[in-house]
Amino acid sequence: LIRQMKEANKKKEEKIKELQEFISRFSANASKSKQATSRKRALEKIQLDEIRPSSRKYPYIDFRPNREIGNEVLTVEGLSKTIDGEKILDNLTFTLGREDKVAFVGGNEFAKTILFKILIGEMEPDEGTYKWGVTTSQAYFPKDFGGEFDNDYNITEWLTQYSEEKDVTYVRGFLGRMLFSGEDGVKKVAVLSGGEKVRCLLSKMMISGANVLLLDEPTNHLDMESITALNNGLIKFPGVL
């Protein structure tokens, strides 16, 4: 919106300059006096839009792996899963290398969620196998994250349980990146909004130092500033997505 306002102002400024030049040149010319007067009226009607500095705040999302990933990342062979009589995964086979960035797209959104749950060990496949490389460490963003916050922790306590470094200042540094500051740290996670919970989960992923990120619709509940920050963080991420 601000860019559009700037472009509109630029066009108005060009028009103002054009009108001023005509008025200056022909205001004393009897044959052009009516045209000059008309342009004066047009000039008076042009108003530049007031552009105020943006008050929007952007989180700082930066996923930094603690360990460089090796060549062998993930091997999936013949993975199948049936739920309530419906075949969700059918003989799925693929491999991931160290430079891969993969998006799972299909008509059944449930399929990728089930695949992720299998790959992180929350669910067993009916058939097939998968194997993570020995140098990999995974961080998972679940589509349904309600259970992650079904406790009495405050935000700082909640994130500390996932951090190897238990120093409060260290943990709050990650929360600060996600726009949690001051008294926010003692807010109970159970009362957080959807967007705040997503920012907590992204803090958890950052603090993990994982070199493989599995994200299941992470932009739900996020505002445009947070989505932009997440996109920038993923672009810079040197690991596997």
Question: What is each model feature region?
Answer:
Residues L1-Y60, D126-E127, Y162-K166, Y170:
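Extended, highly charged alpha-helical segments
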Residues L1-E7, F63-L241:
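ABC ATP-binding cassette signature C-motif
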